Every structure is written in structure tokens, then in C-alpha cells.
């Protein structure tokens, strides 16, 4: 029985999915993905799965695999409005791999998921370029990913990104709450800006309530508001690994959603408290702008934004100088921001005290 061909019948392209545009995006991103390759990576882009030679883990006595999945939230809307896409890829790597390094794990590889309303090959390639550049900074390989076109669910210019990463740590070198002791120092590492959390509040306050334009020059920033908001999230992975190799690090805390105190509390054991002194640093002007424009209370800011601290290291008090020297050698702005105590006046695992400097 022969099939009847109906002129103008339905097709995938007519439904809004452009396979050829997707293929073009893959071709454009290949050169960037190659830059992330590690010796353990087998095969190339375009297979059904990314391959990583696990025999490389034989040098570990008891290797533990660490995994994390994350995205960059509504910061993607700033990128969309600004027409800048590569920085979002950088942000994605930071959000995923800096969660992995917290337990002492070395980042190994990552995969990404890019969801778009319509495939614009150059835009997708720019996002992947940023992911690849971030992977190089984190020391991991980009072994695969997925670009999904969702016409009807997303507008033609809309997109979102997510990623998953894997790392490895020797079992007896796993960092965390069980290593923390009274008297340990809390070392803060400076953030590059807002990073990738709190953008729903920031967008609401600055763009909706404040009526500010992303192209507006902001004197305190020395650049436009949009450029400030798109400042890439700092990637601390290799800095933390270097610190772990040279110093007796007890724990790390990646300051993301929920703010400094809430994330620090996640690694503080029962019976101990982390006391962080606000007077040891001055938050960047962007935090003050958000607070002033929206009349946002300090506690609300601190529950939502990083307030200038992107990563915390907890080390023995006697290791403080060595830790700060290692970070300084790597160009990381860091300082002693507090201590671990067993005093019971604070009911939560971490608390901010005092007032910010400046």
C-alpha cells in the first residue's frame, strides 16, 4: 500500500524545531570543547555519551566520586537583554564545580544542558564557549551536553542553562564538619560580584522598582549596570585545590543561595559555631545599590546575596598565615573573617556580628 503525500503536511521544522541550526551550533562549539580535554577523556563531541577513563583513578586507594548539578538562575535574563552569552557559561561552571571542590574533590568532567526557544547557533556556541573557558579555569573536561529547542514553551530569545559535574577525592582526605575544631580560623575569599544568586531580588529592585536601565553608566561601578550584573562568577576550584595541597584545610563553604551565614552553617558540626565579623571587609558598591534602591533590610540582603564573600576556608589557627600566603600567591583576595567557637550564645551554626567596614 503506497503512502499518500499531503502537500504542506506537518513537519518538525514547521513545529518550530530546526535540526540544521542545531547541527550548525555543534560545529561552532567543537573548537571550544577541545580546549577542555584531559588525558582521561575518550572519544569526541557528538557521541551518545561522554567517556572518561576511570583507570586513572587507580592512583587513589579509595576514590570517592563527588557530583553536583546546578544552574545560574535568572541571571540568564540579564544576559538575554544585554545580548551577551559567554559569561553565563562561565557562571555555570563556577556554580557546579565550586560545589564539588568544597569536599576536597578534584573536578574531573562536566556536562551541560542548554534549553532554548529557538536555536540561534552563534548564541548557543557562545554559551558553550563560556562553559569551555570555565572548565579550563576549573581544571575539568567538558565531555558532552544537550541543546534542546522548546518552541511554544519558551520565547524565541529565551534560554536556560544547567550543568552536572563529577570530581574525585581520596576517602581519607574528604573535607567537612567532622574536621572542624574550636579555635579554627574562618578565611573569606572575595567574590567577583553578585556571582549567580539573588538575581530575582536584584532584577526586581533595580529594574522594576528602581527603573534603572541596563545600559546606564553607574559612577560607582565605572561601567554600565548590565556589565556589572553580568560580571562572571569567580571560579575557586584550582585555588582551593592548591590550598588543600599546601595547608591543613578542615572545610570549605561555597557561598551561594541563602547567603554567607546559611551556607557556612552547613559545614559547622553540632556544638560549635562560626562567628564572622562584618568589620573585616567592605561589600562592593553593587550590594549597597540594591539595598538603597529597594530599602532592603541588611538581614534580607545577607539571606539572599553573598555580600562580597564567595568562598570560605576553615583552617587551624596556626595555619592561617600559610593559607593566606598561598591564596595571595594565586591572586586571591582573602582575609581572616572570623573563628570557630564553642560558646553557646548563638543558636545557629554561623552568625555575622558587627558592622561592615567603610
Q: Across the structure, where does each feature detected by a protein language model lie?
A:
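Glycine-/charge-enriched secondary-structure boundary and capping motifs
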Residues: 2-14, 123-141, 154-159, 213, ...
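N-terminal amphipathic/basic leader segments beginning at the initiator methionine
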Residues: 2-40
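Residue-level signature of catalytic and energy-coupling elements of molecular machines
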Residues: 18, 70, 183, 254, ...
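Hydrophobic face of alpha-helices
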Residues: 26, 125-128, 199
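Buried hydrophobic packing segments
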Residues: 29, 51-54, 96-97, 202-205, ...
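Acidic, glycine-rich loop-and-beta core segments that form the ion-binding/anion-interacting portion
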Residues: 182-227
